[in-house]
UniProtKB/Swiss-Prot annotation:
InterPro entries: ZIP. GO terms for cellular component: apical plasma membrane; plasma membrane. It comes from Xenopus tropicalis. It is found in: Cell membrane; Apical cell membrane. The chain crosses the membrane at residues 4-24, 42-62, 85-105, 170-190, 197-217, 230-250, 263-283, 293-313. This is Zinc transporter ZIP3. Transporter for the divalent cation Zn(2+). Mediates the influx of Zn(2+) into cells from extracellular space.
Amino acid sequence: MNLIFAKVLCLLAILVLMMLGSLIPVKISEADFDKSSRSRKILSLSNSFAGGVFLATCFNALLPAVREKFFDLLKIGNISTDYPLAETIMMVGFFLTVFVEQTVMTFRKEKPSFIDMETFNAGSDIGSDSEFESPFISANHGHNLYEGGHSHHSHSLNIKELSSSSPIRLFSLVFALSAHSVFEGLALGLQEDGNKLLSLFIGVVIHETLVAMALGVSMAKVNTHLKDAIKMAVLVSTMIPIGIVVGMAIQSAQNMASSIASALLQGIAGGTFIFVTFFEILVKELEEKNDRLLKVLFLVLGYTVLAVLVLFKW
């Protein structure tokens, strides 16, 4: 299959699945999401699987590709060094992602009643050891958090506040929340072989669809109007496609500057995958009391599936 065509298919699939994930809960808001323990268990295990996929994507696909790119670039420049450039760039990407998220939270002037940042993670909170509560279930065990009260979390955003914001403010807030998604898209758009593209796509589409579903549930909880829900869903869902398009444009240039940009951006994207895996998925899923070993099994399974897929050419 033509690689450009495959990337376009990835773009469309991610866009459609994230839009559906965001909007379906709004259309069926009468469903009792909080009591659906089976659904939450499935989401939680899927998220753990996605964590394993991201680990394999980062360390079995992206890291070797970035090493190879830097090796070729240094060879062209007749430069010899044993310094771990690929690993360093990945850590730059990791710290950059942490910095962007924490900067947004630091400069927020208020703590409006929920939406919690954890809403952008798709995990469950049943039996959590954490002092923080679920974005879906309040400390009073079942009262709607969106009816009032304040978050134990310092980073919280209000769905109604977001949906009624000016377009520029809405885009800036959602972009800040989804900044790492752009780098995930860049990683997809910059890929040069099919097997790595497939492994990246599987990890991204699983995790980001779950993220979109979590957002959709939160919008349903506060009875967000469909028009406002569509506005939110479109903004969140287009972050990865934007990254894919930019990555494809850079990769198609086929010159020295594009090669350097590709190596740097793929390394930064690798750091983003590390952030998503450890800060958004594992820290959330493995803190819970229920199904811990099962989640570890799905984590290992996700890693194994992608580690095997990387062996094959597609």
